[in-house]
Amino acid sequence: MNQEVGSIMGYLYKLYPVQVYEEEIPQDFAVPSLYFPPASTVDGVDTVSTFQKAYVLNVKLFHENVQKAHNEAERIADTLRSRRGIIPLIQESGEDTGDFIRLSRIETRVSDDYATIVLNWTSRYWYEREDQRSIDGFKFKSGVK
C-alpha cells in the first residue's frame, strides 16, 4: 500500500473508528467495519519532469443494515467535502509530513449489503533521471552577434 492510501485509511479511521480490513474480509467480519481494497490507477503525462497517476479507491462500509451503512458513508463523505477534500499525508509512524492530497471527487453508493465511498485523486511523481554533471559556466572566445 502506498503512503496516500495509508493516509486515507488513517484519516477515515479517525472519522469512523471501527474495525478496518485491508487484505481480505474474513467470513466472520466485524460489523460495523471498513474495507480498503487496492486502489485502481491510470497513468498520464504531466510535465517534462513528472507523470500523473489518477487513483480511484472504493472503500466499503459495513453496518447492521444498508440504511445505517449509507448514513455513515454520507456523514463521512460530507465531512471530507466540508474539509475541501484535503487529506494530510502521514508517515508509517503516524507522523504528519506537512504534505496533503486533495480528493477530486467523493461519491457514495449503496449495494445489497453495504455502502461504498468512492474517492478519486491525482498525484504527481518525478521521472527517474540519470545524474548528470552540472555545467559551471560558459566561456566565449568571440563576440555574440
Swiss-Prot record:
It holds the Pfam family Phage_tail_terminator_8. It comes from the Bacteria. To B.subtilis XkdJ. This is Uncharacterized protein YqbJ. It comes from Bacillus subtilis (strain 168).
